[in-house]
Amino acid sequence: MRLNLETERLILRNLTPEDYRAAFLWCGDPDVARYMVYPVYTKAEDVRTWIETLDPDDPDEYDAGIVLKSTGELIGSGGIYYRPDDDLWTIGYNLRKDQWGNGYAVEMIRALLKYAGRTREIRGIQGTFADANNRSRRVMEKLGMTFAEDVTLTKLDGSASYPGKRYRRIFR
């Protein structure tokens, strides 16, 4: 979905291929990528290729670049993604490590849910995180999500698997 939203502290907008160098700061950081499904990016140009695959016209995917309103810096990305198989929206987010712990992921997800909820029915949300990723657990708890099931998470390239949790919140 095409985005241009503002919250108290953030601008949420679609990523563009020109954002690849800024996005490499989190996509190429092993600490950020540790529990993400993608392996750590080793070349900034590969981040550009990923950004080019995003479809801003897909009505089931609200992908957002997270920009600090105060500085104009692109500090992360994330979104909400409709999954018809369970009629829930999956949440996702990742931020530069120096921006962790500021509540930006929660602020972004709340804004996207409010925006999407104007034209779409949102029955509920879900998200997964690695057991060892307490920061993501806290994000989901702050969004009112609770434990739904244990899961095994595997990197897209198969390089690692780890135990995780799925959290959900049903609105209707």
Model-derived features: where do they sit?
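Sparse recognition of residues in long alpha-helices and their boundaries
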Residues: 39-40, 63, 156
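Conserved GNAT-fold acetyl-CoA-binding loop/helix
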Residues: 31-53
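A short helix-loop-beta-strand connector motif used in the catalytic cores of GNAT acetyltransferases and
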Residues: 52-65
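Acyl-donor (CoA/ACP) binding surface of acyl/acetyltransferases
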Residues: 1-34, 67-172
